[in-house]
Regions:
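C-terminal catalytic/acceptor-binding lobe
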Residues: 334-420, 424-440, 497
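Basic, amphipathic N-terminal segments
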Residues: 2-8, 275, 288-289, 384
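Membrane-interface alpha-helices
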Residues: 153, 507-512
């Protein structure tokens, strides 16, 4: 039987040389990160001059990178604020009918003639496990409050059988409240312990999508080319014009069927109640996603996003064996369409929950686990490299190699940069010999590092300003001085980057 390499989840699913190759590629990201750190630690003892010179050069690189990213962040912020002011409903109404051309990998193009925004259906899937009514209900209510016609929405509440009676009771309550509010509203239960599945969102939402196809879309004869599928985390609250913005983008870009559509996650649902370190981590993630939207070549799907139903059906839905199903769906499409698939930035936000628990300590533990779970995205690196090797003769090689470098560099820098600057950069002073400590370089290393990092604090100041501008209004019962904390919290950014960024990223790479 021929192996479908595009559906591979890990090396254990392969045999022989394929297993050995994929296993090596799985180890590679962690090997590179740990090797970088260990080599610098060892050289700090044997060759402290080399490490000191490297640290100074790295600090200069970091400073230039901070300035570059600050410019990009400002540009992204301006684009977001512009898109929030746009009347996307009016923009859609003003659009003339367009002809959409879908080109399969094999066969003749299919043309949908004279498509208007009102012809589109939006399939919305909320995968849930053990979330409570108070988490899910605002997400569905946001669909009600949006200005997009609800008779064009198919809403699926995808719950897990293993969630037990609690989630089933929540789902039944929501079904009773909303089953007549949309074109279709269904609760779909994902069975537990299905063979070949990893317990996670990917398997749940893939099951829900297949059932939606079998029980709703196919029986009603809906046109695959006129459906956009959105998978939202259960706490995702859309803004009023999200589906108008999405529809407008779909109807106006080239190759709409070869794009996924990515909003910007803003963790505003409970931002005023969350501890300061959780807020800093949440905004740091938002800022990174904002900057990625400007740098489209680096953008992959993340968390809540939308994509053409046609593409989703063609590739066989989400992987049922991955932790990072949100990004894997993009890389699956990218490899399936041989590089002719991109992520289109929407520059439009959705609101989600900050990681938060009953106590600060529990929040810190859960935040670390969340960051570590996000670090599972590194599993896409061996997937991309392996499929590049297997498809070497039929793919645009430079494009694939560029993507591999971007992904490998991104996960490597996530796990190492902050540790190099915050910890290893000082080791030559402690591990170097007395001879090194008597040199001019040794005396100047702390001063040079301090000056460069002080200048680089422009990024921290900018983060405080933009986060304040994006912040939702202060709740009535929240004291006024809490706003001061929203600014002062950024003092802890360096520590947060290490504790809730680099360390969980490195931790995840150590599990191979």
């Amino acid at each position: 039987m021929t192996t479908d390499y595009l559906k591979i989840g890990r090396a254990s699913e392969l045999t022989g040389r394929d297993h050995a190759l994929y296993r090596f590629l799985e180890i590679l990201p962690g090997l590179l990160s740990w090797s970088t750190l260990l080599v610098l630690i060892i050289l700090s003892y044997f060759q402290p001059v080399w490490v000191a010179m490297f640290v100074i050069a790295f600090d200069v690189y970091w400073l230039l990178l901070v300035i570059y990213l600050a410019i990009i962040l400002i540009s992204a912020y301006r684009q977001i604020t512009h898109n929030l002011r746009v009347d996307w409903r009016a923009q859609c109404l003003a659009l003339p009918p367009v002809d959409l051309v879908y080109t399969p990998l094999e066969g003749e193009p299919v043309v949908s003639v004279g498509v208007k925004w009102s012809d589109l259906y939006h399939l919305v899937i909320f995968p849930c496990y053990n979330e409570g009514y108070n988490i899910i209900q605002p997400s569905i209510e946001a669909l009600i409050k949006s200005s997009f016609p609800r008779d064009k929405m198919i809403v699926i509440l995808a719950i897990e059988e293993r969630g037990g009676p609690a989630i089933q009771a929540v789902a039944e309550r929501l079904r009773q409240e909303y089953e007549n509010s949309f074109f279709q509203f269904r609760v779909i239960v994902h069975p537990d312990n299905l063979v070949g599945e990893l317990k996670g969102k990917g398997a749940n939402q893939a099951w829900a999508a297949r059932k939606a196809k079998e029980e709703i879309i196919d029986p009603l004869g809906l046109d695959y080319n006129l459906i956009l599928a959105s998978v939202f985390d259960s706490d995702t609250v859309i803004y009023e014009n999200y589906f108008y913005c999405l529809s407008h983008k779909f109807l106006t870009i080239k190759k709409p069927y070869r794009h996924s559509y990515q909003p910007i996650p803003m963790y505003h649902n409970n931002i005023w109640q969350a501890p300061f370190f959780a807020r800093v981590a949440a905004y740091s993630n938002t800022f990174w996603q904002m900057m990625q939207q400007i740098r489209q070549e680096k953008l992959a799907t993340y968390s809540s996003h939308s994509m053409p139903w046609r593409a989703l059906v063609e590739i066989g839905f989400w992987s049922t064996k991955m932790v990072s199903e949100d990004s894997r769906i993009f890389w699956h499409c990218f490899c399936y369409y041989r590089g002719d698939y991109e992520v289109e930035p929407l520059y439009y936000p959705v609101s989600m929950d900050v990681c938060m628990d009953e106590t600060a300590w529990q929040t810190a533990r859960n935040l670390y686990k969340q960051q570590r779970r996000w670090g599972w995205g590194v599993e896409n690196v061996p997937y991309l490299m392996f499929n590049t090797i297997k498809s070497w003769r039929v793919i645009p090689r430079k494009l694939f190699l560029d993507k591999i470098f971007i992904q490998l560099y991104g996960f490597h820098s996530w796990a190492t940069n902050a540790i190099i600057i915050g910890c290893i950069g000082w080791l030559p002073l402690f591990l170097g010999s007395d001879r090194f400590n008597q040199t001019v370089l040794s005396n100047n290393l702390p001063n040079v590092t301090r000056i460069l990092m002080t200048i680089a604090m422009v990024g921290m100041v900018l983060s405080a300003i933009i986060s304040s501008l994006l912040l939702p209004p202060r709740p009535v019962k929240t004291p006024w001085w809490r706003r001061l904390g929203m600014i002062a919290q950024w003092i802890f950014l360096p520590v947060t980057i290490v504790v809730f960024g680099a360390i969980p990223g490195l931790d995840r790479k150590s599990v191979v």
